[in-house]
Amino acid sequence: MDQMKIGGFIALCRKEKGWTQSQLAEILGITDKAVSKWETGKSLPDYALLTPLSEALGITLSELCTPDMGDN
């Protein structure tokens, strides 16, 4: 999994919802700093958060783990 690509995709999906990092963090019960780390490619979401994150963003697990952002 490409951390930078996944992080960018999380940020894109979050912004499409009109949410701040803090709002997404609150939905998931985590800190906004964790969301920031994902979006900057410094870390990946914990395995236990993948399903809640994909559901919150309205995407599939497959889309989350292998984002196609049109750069192929």
Model-predicted regions and their roles:
Residues 48-63:
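DNA major-groove recognition helix of helix-turn-helix/homeodomain DNA-binding modules
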Residues 40:
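Short, conserved catalytic or interaction motifs in soluble domains
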Residues 18-37, 52:
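Short alpha-helical DNA-recognition segment
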Residues 66-72:
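Short, charged recognition helix plus adjacent turn
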Residues 1-16:
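A short, Lys/Arg-rich alpha-helix, primarily the initiator
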Residues 2, 20, 31-34, 46, ...:
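Short coil turns linking two alpha-helices in DNA-binding domains
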